[in-house]
């Protein structure tokens, strides 16, 4: 259903698109999907690894199976999909791989141990793909989004019953030099840049689009 909606949105703009459904943690399924795409459309020139999940549970209460599931989708899947597209990129001596990392690639926070472990690993996978395949003119970079104003985060930004701000909303705005949540469209420019020839000399880099959170220690108390 989500794929159909996406295809319809592209069609409404006059853009021809192809949609495929695949379990990105299933290596044979991914290999088959990549082969199908190559046959129907052509080999993949730009890969964006953006599938991901999060489990918010204190580490001492987290099931090992849940930890593995987060690692499987957030770290193993980007490895599996990148592995599948790399041979064609190597043959063409050109390719772009963009991994969606996170501020948790750099920071820790309560209840997200599995997510932070996966995103930290994805940062290093990004750098290693750069190191291993840069000689083939393949660029692998990452985008580390900050806190984005999406329908999923809307409950965290809504006013409380007494008219006060949600505590997490206040927390994020205080931690962000910009003093606000980021708009999804603000990720567009970085993604286009990393997918274009303008970034041919940029490799192994994580571009943090976070409103300055990682650079900011917070305001000094008065």
Language-model segment annotations:
Residues 58-59, 66-71, 168, 172:
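Substrate-binding pocket helix/loop in short-chain dehydrogenase/reductase
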Residues 48, 134, 139, 202-204:
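Short, small/polar-rich loop/turn modules that mediate ligand/substrate recognition or access, typified
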Residues 59-61, 107-113, 135-136, 179, ...:
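Active-site loop immediately N-terminal to the catalytic Tyr-X3-Lys motif
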Residues 79, 94, 180-209, 214:
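C-terminal substrate-recognition "lid" of short-chain dehydrogenase/reductases
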Residues 87, 131-135, 200:
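Alpha-helical segment proximal to the catalytic Tyr-Lys
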Residues 102:
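Residue(s) in the substrate-gating loop at a strand-loop-helix junction
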Residues 82, 118, 126:
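Active-site helix of classical SDR
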